[in-house]
Amino acid sequence: MKLLRNHVFWTVLSVFFACSQLQAGTLVLSSKFVNDNKDRATITVQLEVDEHLTHAHKIDKGGDDGDVHMAGRADEVRLPLVAEILNAAKETSSMQVLNQSSPASKIAVKGVWRLWFEHPSPNQMIQGNTVAKPINSNPDHVFEIHPITQFGNNSVVDSFVPIANKTTHYTAYPAATAFPKYEALKSTIKNNGSAISITSTKAGYNYAEFIIELAAKPTAVSDGFLVLAKIFDVSDEEEPVVSDLRRMVFVKGTPPSDALNGLGKGDHLHVMGIPRVNLTEVLAAAKAGKTVNTRLPYEMIIVAVFPE
């Protein structure tokens, strides 16, 4: 009976949002998932790894970011997903586990949940629909576990440092380039009570380098810290690149979280971060039964702090 109710729920959901405007991509999430994860940094899943790279990307700029991609399926997410290890070449034990894995096996994975419309499907992505087995390591998706913090029995929190190898340092996007792009993203949000639809223009600019000025003392959550901050380009710490405050996400036990310890209002950090959809703001913007057109709410996952 429970399976029947779930099938009916997701069928009704598909019909309800069938007429949603398709721009670059439309994602439909269960309201429970949004409420459960909106103020969390991470998610834990049993990941069936279907496709993966066998070695890390080279390090340069843009997509040459030193990550390793894997695509798979997880009952906890029920969406096409890609998981990524930061500074993967340094995580030799995790790379060994990945390369020895078989598609039939599942690996316990914990990491930062991330929704971002960089690689959306042309079709609606409805949480709970059957997820097709991916045919490569970077299929159409908007859900990621990125960066991973635990891969099998291996902790990889030490990967949350500037991306580099012995000869090369990664060049992230300057704040003056990336943040105007984030701010320009448009979205349509619709809430029917049991599910929330987000339609967004296509996004990009994965890694940005910037200065943050904390607007308050960080708030502790179960798996990290959240804090509002002003955002500056490294070349100009006088004029913020965004007129409003934006939320920063720090993962407990990582070097960025350690660097945050003891800081408060007015303190600065030189960081690298990646954007994700801010589900707290999505929920606040959503009006039951109404369509809301707004900028795409986003926040920044802090993946590294640069030494001063």
For each predicted feature, which ranges?
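OB-fold and OB-like single-stranded nucleic-acid-recognition modules
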Residues: 25-308
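Intrinsic disorder/low-complexity segments enriched in polar/small residues
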Residues: 3, 22-24
